[in-house]
């Protein structure tokens, strides 16, 4: 009797640390579905689906959740030893040299988690001849690219610790112009006080443009004129046959490429073109992609909270993928614009009435 009670006592003591009963399919059972080399492939190919990553500067991978970036905030000043009308003399040769200073402030890369969930019918999993990964991979890439781009451009679902979105920060610095503000699209973009000039006046050189798809038509409508003032029919913002006669045309603005994301990340009600010194934007990845297979979960719409999938009831599984990444625009001081509130390396071409 005492021996049975003792065994019961031991079981009660050990119960909290005994492994819980697993109601999900462990990772080992789906290794064929997500080979290790594909995890690296995702990280390598996400930039292809993200215009921010394509144009921005990729910093080294982060080893911690936060990385400090020292950013120059005060510039040194040089002084003449013998200024003004004073004639050089023995006394002036012994004059004290003036002091100057430099200063740095810290900006931070804060890595936040980005998740993608792909729901898959179990019937598809049972089909061993079906190349499931070939179907999942492009959708994962697309989802990562859209989410990151919209967070950077517009602050959509962005973590609170991340910097202000590009559009918000550019407008706060006065770096925006609306369609038709100068009376002519050419002047809006390239004229005095136009889109590109706003960035240049802040001490940065524009090296790329991210545009809404509708701007392609507007660009095609701007055509060169001949000596008689008549339009020749040649689009002035297209560099024809950039890669030879068989190559595709490339849209350029002031000699720098314009890209038109097809992933739906650009909201034309907020920006028609985002022009900037893109290497001033840096991003970094905290860790590679991780995976988990969900078998009996309920998937909800994050906005409406309505149930999108009931995996157990609908004979489905869901593959959840996660990665952690960060971005920042250090916006260092320069000689042309020393006021940080007025300085920003991006400008926004906004729709009329915005």
Model-derived regions: residue spans:
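Protruding loop/beta-arch "assembly-hinge" segments enriched in small, turn-prone residues
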Residues: 5, 22-30, 309-354
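Classical Sec-dependent N-terminal signal peptides that target proteins to the secretory pathway
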Residues: 7-16
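Assembly/oligomerization interface modules of large self-assembling protein complexes
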Residues: 23-116
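Extended oligomerization regions of viral-like shell subunits
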Residues: 62-63, 165, 170-317, 323
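Short loop/turn segments at secondary-structure transitions that flank enzyme active sites
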Residues: 73-78, 115-117, 124, 146, ...
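Short helix/loop capping segments that flank catalytic or ligand/cofactor-binding pockets
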Residues: 77-82, 128, 218-221, 283, ...
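Alpha-helical scaffold segments that mediate packing/assembly in large oligomeric complexes
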Residues: 97-99, 104-108, 113-198, 252, ...
């Amino acid at each position: 009797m005492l021996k049975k009670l003792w065994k019961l006592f031991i079981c009660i003591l050990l119960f909290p640390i005994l492994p819980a009963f697993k109601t999900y399919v462990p990772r080992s059972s789906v290794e064929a579905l997500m080979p290790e080399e594909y995890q690296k492939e995702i990280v390598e190919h996400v930039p292809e689906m993200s215009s921010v990553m394509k144009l921005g500067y990729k910093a080294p991978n982060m080893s911690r959740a936060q990385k400090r970036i020292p950013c120059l905030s005060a510039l040194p000043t040089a002084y003449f030893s013998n200024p003004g009308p004073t004639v050089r003399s023995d006394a002036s040769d012994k004059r004290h040299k003036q002091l100057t200073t430099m200063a740095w402030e810290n900006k931070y890369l804060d890595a936040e988690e980005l998740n993608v969930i792909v729901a898959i019918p179990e019937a598809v999993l049972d089909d061993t001849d079906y190349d499931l990964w070939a179907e999942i991979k492009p959708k994962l890439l697309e989802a990562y690219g859209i989410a990151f781009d919209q967070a950077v451009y517009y602050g959509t679902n962005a973590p609170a610790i991340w910097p202000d979105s590009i559009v918000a920060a550019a407008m706060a610095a006065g770096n925006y112009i609306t369609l038709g503000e100068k009376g002519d699209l050419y002047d809006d973009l390239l004229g005095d006080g136009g889109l590109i000039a706003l960035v240049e006046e802040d001490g940065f050189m524009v090296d790329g443009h991210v545009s809404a798809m509708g701007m392609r038509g507007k660009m095609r409508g701007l055509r060169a004129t001949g000596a008689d003032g008549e339009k020749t029919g040649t689009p002035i913002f297209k560099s024809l046959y950039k890669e030879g006669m068989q190559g595709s045309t490339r849209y350029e603005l002031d000699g720098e490429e314009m890209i038109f994301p097809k992933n739906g990340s650009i909201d034309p009600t907020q920006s028609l073109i985002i022009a900037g010194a893109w290497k001033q934007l840096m991003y970094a990845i905290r860790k590679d992609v991780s995976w988990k297979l969900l078998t009996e979960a309920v998937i909800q719409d994050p906005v409406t909270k309505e149930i999108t999938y009931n995996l157990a009831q609908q004979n489905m599984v869901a593959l959840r993928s996660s990665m952690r990444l960060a971005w920042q625009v250090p916006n260092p001081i320069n000689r042309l614009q020393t006021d940080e509130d007025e300085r920003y390396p991006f400008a926004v071409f906004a729709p009329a009435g915005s």
